[in-house]
């Protein structure tokens, strides 16, 4: 059957926050609809009133420019009573009933929610992909060879009985299956929190920005550094780090000669040489306090760039992020410099979002 909506994959428990973000951002852009979400389902829908706006809506902003969605899929068909006997045939029949959004797709992903229930679908989805891909190619829906430069077809099984059919565009979608970038924990890191910063560096900064922000020989400050998970990522890239925490920093980091440990309050500490290239912060504090502190460092040029986490409350999480970032952005907008700002709820984040702020000149924007 026909279904016109934006399907957003998200962390379980964040469905309502994801729905609030979609409603706010699409509504402000004039793409009107209504959200549907179920707690702990791992996804949310934004149903459009005007089906003709589907492609225009999904290109309104890329998934990496959103906060809570891991993937944004433009859904144009759904099957609410999938039968075991001929699932491939049912998908093909559903596609025959709708207008083809593109002449051909370059790839297909068969996906499922990132939940305990979703994991029971994982094996089936992997096995189902091969015969489905073959049938789609035979029916003229897929290129003979995978072409990731073309739109991708997504078959999302919410359960064994319900699946949604949609597409993503390569310029606006996550490249990762389920929208999840899985990273391997480095055995020599003192803390699993290191994956949060690595996730941000890999997925929120372009290669050019990484070279600019993480230059070997540069200086950084890590507020709330103990035991050194974030410092580890900076040292690994050859940066000198002022690690600020009343707790101890791992001996393995101190022995590199790149780390200075200062037992001090993160809110009152100032850089040893007046400024640093990068400020990072994963302190457990109120969102508005962290946003103000980060603003102070950037406005007063104590730091050129910043990467930090904002811890989230149990309720009004989207609104909390917007309020904190609106306040911070207003301070940055008053400066002569320009800033590339991103806010993401990364896979390795829990009840927090990660913010990257890269300073540029006005001419670079």
Curated annotation (Swiss-Prot):
Superkingdom, taxonomy of origin: Bacteria
Subunit structure: Monomer.
Gene Ontology terms for molecular function: S-adenosylmethionine-dependent methyltransferase activity
Active site residues according to the UniProt entry: 311
Family: Belongs to the class I-like SAM-binding methyltransferase superfamily. RNA methyltransferase RlmE family. RlmM subfamily.
Function: Catalyzes the 2'-O-methylation at nucleotide C2498 in 23S rRNA.
Signal sequence coordinates: none
Gene giving rise to this polypeptide: rlmM
GO CC, alphabetical: cytoplasm
Listed name of the protein: Ribosomal RNA large subunit methyltransferase M
EC number: 2.1.1.186
InterPro entries given in the database record: RlmM_FDX (IPR040739), RlmM_THUMP-like (IPR048646), RNA_MeTrfase_FtsJ_dom (IPR002877), rRNA_MeTrfase_M (IPR011224), SAM-dependent_MTases_sf (IPR029063)
GO biological process terms on file: methylation; rRNA processing
Alphabetic keyword roster: Cytoplasm, Methyltransferase, rRNA processing, S-adenosyl-L-methionine, Transferase
Binding site for S-adenosyl-L-methionine: 193, 226-229, 245, 265, 282
Catalysis performed (reactions): cytidine(2498) in 23S rRNA + S-adenosyl-L-methionine = 2'-O-methylcytidine(2498) in 23S rRNA + S-adenosyl-L-homocysteine + H(+)
Gene3D superfamilies: 3.30.2300.20, 3.30.70.2810, Vaccinia Virus protein VP39
Location in or out of the cell: Cytoplasm
Family matches, as Pfam families: FtsJ (PF01728), RlmM_FDX (PF18125), RLMM_N (PF21239)
């Amino acid at each position: 059957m026909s279904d016109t909506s934006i399907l957003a994959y998200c962390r379980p428990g964040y469905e309502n926050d994801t729905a609030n973000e979609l409603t706010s951002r699409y509504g402000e852009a004039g793409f009107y609809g209504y959200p549907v979400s179920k707690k702990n389902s791992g996804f949310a829908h934004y149903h459009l009133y005007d089906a003709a706006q589907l492609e225009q809506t999904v290109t309104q902003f890329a998934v990496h420019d959103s906060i809570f969605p891991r993937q944004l899929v433009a859904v144009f068909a759904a099957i609410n009573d999938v039968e075991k006997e001929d699932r491939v045939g049912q998908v093909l029949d559903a596609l025959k009933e709708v207008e083809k959004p593109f002449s051909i797709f370059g790839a297909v992903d068969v996906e499922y929610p990132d939940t305990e229930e979703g994991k029971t679908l994982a094996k089936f989805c992997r096995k189902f992909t091969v015969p489905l891909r073959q049938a789609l190619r035979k029916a003229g829906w897929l290129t003979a060879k995978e072409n990731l430069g073309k739109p991708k077809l997504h078959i999302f099984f919410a359960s064994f009985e319900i699946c949604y059919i949609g597409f993503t565009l390569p310029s606006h979608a996550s490249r990762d299956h389920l929208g999840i970038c899985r990273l391997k924990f480095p055995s020599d890191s003192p803390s699993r929190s290191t994956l949060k910063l690595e996730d941000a560096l890999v997925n929120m900064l372009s290669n050019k920005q990484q070279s600019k922000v993480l230059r070997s020989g540069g200086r950084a400050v890590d507020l709330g550094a103990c035991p050194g998970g974030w410092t580890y990522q900076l040292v690994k890239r050859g940066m000198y780090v002022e690690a600020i925490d009343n707790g101890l920093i791992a001996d393995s980091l101190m022995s590199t000669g790149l780390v200075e440990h200062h037992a001090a309050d993160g809110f009152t500490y100032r850089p040893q040489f007046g400024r640093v290239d990068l400020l990072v912060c994963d302190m457990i504090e109120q969102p508005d306090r962290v946003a103000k502190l980060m603003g102070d460092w950037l406005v007063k040029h104590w730091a050129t760039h910043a990467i930090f986490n904002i811890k989230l409350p149990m309720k009004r999480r989207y609104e909390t992020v917007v309020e904190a970032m609106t306040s911070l952005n207003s301070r940055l907008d008053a400066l002569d410099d320009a800033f590339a700002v991103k806010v993401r709820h990364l896979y390795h984040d829990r009840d927090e979002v990660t913010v990257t702020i890269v300073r540029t000149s006005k001419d670079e924007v």
